[in-house]
Curated annotation (Swiss-Prot):
Catalysed reactions listed for this entry: (2S,6S)-2,6-diaminopimelate = meso-2,6-diaminopimelate
Gene: dapF
Designated name of the protein: Diaminopimelate epimerase
Function per UniProt: Catalyzes the stereoinversion of LL-2,6-diaminopimelate (L,L-DAP) to meso-diaminopimelate (meso-DAP), a precursor of L-lysine and an essential component of the bacterial peptidoglycan.
Lineage: Bacteria, Pseudomonadati, Pseudomonadota, Betaproteobacteria, Burkholderiales
Record organism: Burkholderia pseudomallei (strain K96243)
Entry GO MF terms: diaminopimelate epimerase activity
């Protein structure tokens, strides 16, 4: 079967986008997702995104995300920006703002006149059981309004914030994000048994109260050039700990995101993420068996 696709990226976090809205697509197996995402023998991507018809009232589209390991995940902020650019560029909507169904609810995506996309990422969740994170038997340490949890990582105790942005995140503050051994500690944190669904590991260096450098080791994808939900989780943790003030410029290896959150006044407030969305090329590929 021939499969039309669009290759896109948001701040270097790259995606294969498939249109399941105007045409019926067969259910993709994990092996097929891995083959399409393979950078040597496939198209190459951190994630595969599916555009589908919504199944809930009030949504314009349904947005599904598969990591390059073949597993379906809850959310991807950089992918969300590419999603709205895709549906507008392909004539699926003329709206500047669209409401999109994801696993944990409905989010709003808005295309700005300057070509950037603003995503209402929803409110963060800090309650360990809802991340989910097993905090049983641990003595947390308060910093500001946040609780830091001790996690043994390769023989060293790391103090982490746990945050859900619809997907789980563990955030730690480091002195130098560029020099930190992200690809050593990242896999250990991702697979720590206290995270029953595994976790995205964020490593944040605070430059000023409005600026950070961030690297994220993503669950099921490894270190990526940018992670939108990871940027939101890091900023939320930093504001909650009293280290950051909104808005925050987040520098990643792939580009810059701007995160705004009124959480110092109301933790139920949604995080707003602004950043680029870019189409790289379009093509047709034979769907692997």
């Amino acid at each position: 079967m021939k499969l039309s696709f669009t290759k896109m990226h948001g701040a270097g976090n790259d995606f294969v986008v498939l249109d399941g809205y105007t045409r019926a697509l067969p259910p993709l197996t994990g092996a097929q997702v891995r083959a399409l995402a393979d950078r040597h023998f496939g198209i190459g991507a951190d994630q595969l995104l599916l555009v589908e018809k919504p199944t809930v009232d009030g949504a314009d589209f349904k947005y599904r995300i598969f990591n390059c390991d073949g597993g379906e995940v809850e959310h991807c902020g950089n992918g969300a920006r590419c999603f709205v650019k895709f549906v507008r560029d392909h004539g699926l909507t003329g709206k500047a703002s669209v409401r999109v169904e994801v696993k944990h609810g409905v989010i709003t995506l808005t295309m700005q006149d300057n070509g950037e996309v603003v995503v209402d990422m929803g409110a963060p969740v800090f309650e360990p059981a809802r991340v989910p994170f097993d905090a049983s038997g641990l003595d947390g340490r308060r910093e500001g309004a946040d609780t830091l949890w001790p996690l043994p990582v390769n023989g060293v105790t790391r103090w982490i914030s746990v945050v859900s942005m619809g997907n789980p995140h563990a955030v730690q503050i480091v002195d130098d994000a560029e020099a930190f051994a992200v690809r050593v500690d990242g896999p250990a944190i991702e697979c720590d048994p206290r995270f029953p669904q595994r976790v995205n590991a964020g490593f944040m260096q605070i430059v000023s109260r409005h600026e950070v450098n961030l690297r994220v080791y993503e669950r099921g994808a490894g270190e990526t050039l940018a992670c939108g939900t990871g940027a939101c989780a890091a900023v939320a943790a930093g504001i909650r700990r009293g280290r950051l003030d909104s808005p925050v410029t987040v520098h990643t290896h792939g580009g810059t995101l701007t995160i705004s959150w009124n959480g110092a006044c109301d933790e139920r407030a949604p995080l707003m993420m602004a950043g680029p969305a870019t189409t790289v090329f379009e093509g047709v590929i034979e769907l692997p068996a």
